């Protein structure tokens, strides 16, 4: 059972976070703590022990930023579009009403710790302009910097953003609202301005990820004797180094 705990000291209009819906009927255990920081912005701390879940998106224009603390987080939006996060990576999406309405997620290691930042750009910008005009964020610029003409991206968060993500994750349970608001605004400003590194999205393809799962299952169920990496690589027409790279990306070990 996944326990979903809401923490809201803002006193603003009640809000239903987007990502928690997929966990209500998921098989597994763990906790999701949702912290409402200000109108249009909330963060979720996820500590899960499970294999899979299905997420349904309905809120058009919502920006969702996931950061991996520990474990692996794999999401497939279609037969071709797949995301695989390892610690220090982030994934950004903005549901446009067409792409990513449904996604299938897996946790290859059976456990996951992460942070999800959900932003309603219009509500957040309105709140910032009224309450923190000196720290306003241009969400159109943020989306252009992160996504360009795409609806999702993924890759390394980079040292500056990773530091702030981890500060949020570690300090959210203390519920110091002023500190958490400051950190979220800092993160949004960084994401608006830091150029995305070349090589973003250059991770294992969906086919490679599925192959890694297949090979792992083969190794676990093979009862006929020892099979070397060289044999597996040859059988599937890839090099040993490429096979090791796939396992490293998906499971954290070569």
What role is predicted for each listed range?
Residues 14-113:
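N-terminal functional module of multi-domain proteins
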Residues 41, 60, 64, 175, ...:
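Short, well-structured alpha-helical interface segments that form or flank functional binding sites
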Residues 57, 204-208, 221:
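Residue-level marker of regulatory loop/turn positions in helix-turn-helix DNA-binding domains and
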Residues 212-233, 249-254:
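Terminal helix-turn-helix DNA-binding modules in bacterial transcription factors
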């Amino acid at each position: 059972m996944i326990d979903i705990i809401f923490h809201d000291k803002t006193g603003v209009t009640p809000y239903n976070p987007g990502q928690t819906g997929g966990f209500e009927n998921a098989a597994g255990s763990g906790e999701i703590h949702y912290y409402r920081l200000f109108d249009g912005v909330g963060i979720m701390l996820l500590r899960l022990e499970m294999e899979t879940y299905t997420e349904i998106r309905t809120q058009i224009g919502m920006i969702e930023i996931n950061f991996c603390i520990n474990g692996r987080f794999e999401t497939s939006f279609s037969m071709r579009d797949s995301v695989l996060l390892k610690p220090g990576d982030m994934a950004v999406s903005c549901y446009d009403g067409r792409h990513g309405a449904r996604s299938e997620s897996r946790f290859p290691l059976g456990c996951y710790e992460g942070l999800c930042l959900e932003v309603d750009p219009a509500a957040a910008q309105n709140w910032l302009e009224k309450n923190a005009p000196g720290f306003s964020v241009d969400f159109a610029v943020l989306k252009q910097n992160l996504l360009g003409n795409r609806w999702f991206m993924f890759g390394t968060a980079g040292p500056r953003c990773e530091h702030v993500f981890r500060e949020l994750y570690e300090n959210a349970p203390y519920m110091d609202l002023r500190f958490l608001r400051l950190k979220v605004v800092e993160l949004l400003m960084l994401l608006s301005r830091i150029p995305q590194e070349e090589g973003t999205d250059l991770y294992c393809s969906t086919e490679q990820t599925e192959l890694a799962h297949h090979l792992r299952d083969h190794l676990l169920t093979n009862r006929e004797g020892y099979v070397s990496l060289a044999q597996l690589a040859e059988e599937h027409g890839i090099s040993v180094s490429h096979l090791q790279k796939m396992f490293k990306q998906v499971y954290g070990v070569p």
